[in-house]
């Protein structure tokens, strides 16, 4: 089919979820073949996908759709490492979004009794906490493990603050070999310089 498309000398190629119905092994092989095939095409290619890895491997720039509106086009590296919106942050895999508000010393996270040394974007903000910013430690903030999820490659602990059962939950990937159980109380530090924030 692609050979017929290129034979017609198109000015633009649109690929709409080209691998959505394929298993992982077949998808990977076809993706490599498609990349080789399209390397000779000099025109623009519009690639629609919900797979971030697929986009990262195949595209130089990206435009995210958020509630039917297109966000500004950005390069893939910027999207992955410096997502500009909450929608973009969710797309690249961030899972922890905590409500906070401006206070003396930075941003106070609602329910967690923690103040992050961040310059607040507004009076009320949403703070995105990458899992890499959560460091389990002997001292620091305390949290209770409310759930343990054993995934294919990782073990994830879902945390809530000891003092507030209604606060927003925090998801952390446990170091290999660390065992925790529901109800355990653990301590952690938070690397504020890795966190992102937006006006709420």
Place the predicted regions along the sequence by residue.
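Non-catalytic connector elements of ABC transporters
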Residues: 95, 105-200
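Alpha-helix N-cap/helix-start and coil->helix boundary motif
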Residues: 52-53, 85-86, 97, 177-180
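C-terminal boundary and immediately downstream tail of ABC-type ATPase nucleotide-binding domains
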Residues: 80-103, 128
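ABC ATPase nucleotide-binding domains
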Residues: 1-84
